[in-house]
């Protein structure tokens, strides 16, 4: 059997073939669905940072992705081409469904298209030139729109599933090793202001931001324990 080399062109083609049908799942699925998958308790429930299907609390771009996620809607809207391009096969039907969802019976395609044009400046989607009723999602722009809130909610949900560990137990767990300075000690990857800037949340328990004085005490305790162990060994 003849083997074909895997080139960069092949990789690019594979990515393009996936197109929007793979990328849009980022915005309809739960980003914490697999978080703690192996160890979550029965009371743990995932967060849905988007909206539930059928909900009226939805934006137009989310609604379009919802329609595109169901192959039963291919008679009115469908993916076309690559990299997030889609076409309104029956624009009047799409507009009717959007009006039904938002309780606006007078909705039509003219109004819907004006709403879509609002997304151009937001880098959420663009009109495909030369093709009627064809649009293209900009997933980089969508990521910028969605990521801040979803990340913060996922982190907050993640930390809420853990009981705080008392500070007195840090030295017993040997979490502070010799040579680790205050600036390098952080439970979460990233600085607290970056992760908690919107809600003024504090990092979980003692691990997020332990003061320099606390760290100094713990290091001193560890040093004394090590010294006592050495003395006991020779005595």
Curated annotation (Swiss-Prot):
Xref: InterPro entries: Ets_dom (IPR000418), ETS_fam (IPR046328), WH-like_DNA-bd_sf (IPR036388), WH_DNA-bd_sf (IPR036390)
Main subcellular localisation: nucleus
Residues that span the membrane, as ranges: none
Gene Ontology biological-process entries: cell differentiation; hematopoietic stem cell differentiation; nervous system development; regulation of DNA-templated transcription; regulation of transcription by RNA polymerase II
A Gene Ontology term for the protein's cellular component: nucleus
GO MF assignments: DNA-binding transcription factor activity, RNA polymerase II-specific; transcription cis-regulatory region binding
Cellular compartment(s): Nucleus
Expression (tissue specificity): Expressed by serotonergic neurons in anterior and posterior raphe.
UniProt keyword list: Developmental protein, Differentiation, DNA-binding, Neurogenesis, Nucleus, Transcription, Transcription regulation
DNA-binding annotation, residue ranges on this chain: 58-138
Family under the similarity heading: Belongs to the ETS family.
Biological role: Functions as a transcriptional regulator. Functions in the differentiation and the maintenance of the central serotonergic neurons. May play a role in cell growth.
Protein name (Swiss-Prot/TrEMBL): Protein FEV
Source lineage: Eukaryota, Metazoa, Chordata, Craniata, Vertebrata
Protein encoded by which gene: fev
């Amino acid at each position: 059997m003849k083997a074909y080399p895997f080139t960069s062109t092949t990789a690019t083609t594979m990515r393009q073939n996936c197109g929007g049908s793979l990328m849009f799942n980022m915005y309809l699925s739960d980003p914490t669905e697999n978080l703690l998958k192996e160890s979550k308790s029965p009371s743990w429930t995932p967060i849905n940072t988007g909206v539930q299907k059928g909900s009226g609390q939805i934006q137009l771009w989310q609604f379009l992705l919802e329609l595109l996620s169901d192959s039963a809607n291919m008679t009115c809207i469908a993916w076309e081409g690559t990299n997030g391009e889609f076409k309104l096969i029956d624009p009047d039907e799409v507009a009717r469904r959007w009006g039904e969802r938002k309780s606006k019976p007078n909705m039509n395609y003219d109004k819907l298209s004006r709403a879509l044009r609002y997304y151009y400046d937001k880098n959420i989607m663009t009109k495909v030139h030369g093709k009627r009723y064809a649009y293209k999602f900009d997933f980089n722009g969508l990521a910028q729109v969605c990521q801040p809130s979803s990340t913060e909610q996922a982190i907050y949900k993640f930390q809420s599933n853990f009981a705080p560990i008392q500070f007195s137990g840090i030295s017993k767990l040997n979490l502070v090793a010799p040579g680790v300075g205050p600036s390098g000690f952080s439970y979460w990857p990233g600085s607290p202001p970056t992760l908690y800037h919107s809600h003024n949340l504090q990092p979980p328990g003692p691990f997020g931001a332990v003061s320099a004085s606390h760290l100094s005490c713990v290091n001193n305790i560890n040093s004394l324990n090590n010294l006592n162990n050495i003395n006991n060994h020779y005595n």
